[in-house]
Amino acid sequence: MGKLSTYNHKKVTCALGNHIVSGYADDSFITVEADGDGTTYVTGADGEIVRSIDPSSVYKLKLTLLQTSSTNAFLQKMYDKDQKSGTGTFSVNINDLLGSEKFSGGPAWVTKPAAWIRGKAQANREWEIVVSAGEFK
């Protein structure tokens, strides 16, 4: 018999400081992407190759939320606080409770407010957060 695995989006948790994210969009709602160059290389005229490993541990976190999510207000508050006093940073902890993947880092901050859209139906809001010293565990 083959191996059976289970994924349940309800078992993915995301904490921003002491705020628990809720009101996720109905499709992809968390994206974590390395912001550095990873490993680059240069090939010399004689064919010798030199690799350079980017020391950056900065990541970009994108959260896609429903228009009515209370997390929108939290992220806007943190952005406003950061713009006013430079103190709008927080830690990030993402955990897939059914899997073995975890991501954490910080300090983190909101780069700019999500687009504000209104129409016939609800519109998702996408927030971009920079996470310093991020790591997958």
Residue ranges and their predicted role:
Residues 2-67, 99-101, 107-122, 126, ...:
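Solvent-exposed edge beta-strands and adjacent loop segments
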Residues 57-59, 64-83:
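Short, conserved turn/kink motifs that form compact alpha/beta structural patches or helix kinks used as
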Residues 63, 92-94, 129:
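Generic recognition of well-ordered secondary-structure surfaces with a strong bias
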Residues 75-104:
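Short, acidic/charged, Gly/Pro-enriched secondary-structure junctions
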Residues 131-133:
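Residues on the solvent-exposed faces and adjacent turns
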